[in-house]
Amino acid sequence: MQNLYLFITIIKKSDGKEFLDFFLNHKVAPIYSTICHGAATSETLSLLGLERSDKVLMQSIVTTVKMYELKAGLTREMKLDLPDRGIALAVPLTSIASKRIFEHIINEQNNDIPENFVIPERKIEMELIIAICLKGNSDKIMKVAREAGATGGTVVKAKGTASESDMFFGMAISDEKEILYIVSRKEKKSDIMKAIASYTNEHGTHPLTFSLPVTETAGFRLLE
């Protein structure tokens, strides 16, 4: 069966239209976008005299062939390998609920497969760590993650949808949340997650933290 991936791109908000056009030109749709920001601490930003700038997180479902096409295009056309340009990563999916949607993605994206295309052998070397925490806690969690080896992160604003009475380890599910995305090397994942767990247990905050495998990346100059 043709493999599918969640393809995530994080860029500056001011570059959003340019990258959207890139994806549409490469026949990738639909694209789901949300505003986010980098996880630099407020103290660091103040020290450097900077303001927290908005970013855009774009997500779409792509095939194996399209994933490699996008990775090459993002580097060649969009210069994603340049500093502060952005990052991209692919997370493998194990299933998709709708057979019709699955077939639509396959048919739309695999029309122009190169005749000599060979899927490279993949070795999982990166992980996407996701921590869902109460609003205002992402800076503190990112600080301990950095101390454990994380090089950066991205924060997305979110909100729980359960009733106000529902609690999860003392955290009201319906409260405003922050979702922290951290991409790390596989060998550093355990240290980072243990550091987050140790800090949150000590301070009584209990984010939901988990990790996903990352098969391909672009723009990670410090990690690749």
Regions found by a protein language model. Name each.
Residues 1-224:
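Positively charged, small/polar-rich N-terminal and surface patches that mediate targeting and assembly
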